[in-house]
């Protein structure tokens, strides 16, 4: 199987988000990369499901709370930007201050 670089990046996000969710289920607080992976994964999948950019920008702020992550992580993540594939093409989705 030959994957293009973009497909490899998406696959890496899926694996990282899966690992993060498993750690979260064990009661662990998420670190910076785990938090970004979960948010990114949910945005990509939301786009695939047909949600709008505006809807995803709002949805991205509801995925994780300060209680879900290690101390200092919310202050480290100012924006999460992801290129997602929508039914009408690829668009950039930006979520500002995603962990509240």
Swiss-Prot record:
GO terms for cellular component: cytoplasm. InterPro entries: Urease_gamma, Urease_gamma/gamma-beta_su, Urease_gamma_sf, Urease_subunit. Pathway: Nitrogen metabolism; urea degradation; CO(2) and NH(3) from urea (urease route): step 1/1. Its EC number is 3.5.1.5. Signal peptide: none annotated. It catalyses: urea + 2 H2O + H(+) = hydrogencarbonate + 2 NH4(+). It comes from the Bacteria. Pfam families: Urease_gamma. Transmembrane segments: none annotated. GO terms for biological process: urea catabolic process. Keywords: Cytoplasm, Hydrolase. GO terms for molecular function: nickel cation binding; urease activity. PANTHER family: UREASE (PTHR33569:SF1). Belongs to the urease gamma subunit family. Heterotrimer of UreA (gamma), UreB (beta) and UreC (alpha) subunits. Three heterotrimers associate to form the active enzyme. This is Urease subunit gamma. It comes from Arthrobacter sp. (strain FB24).
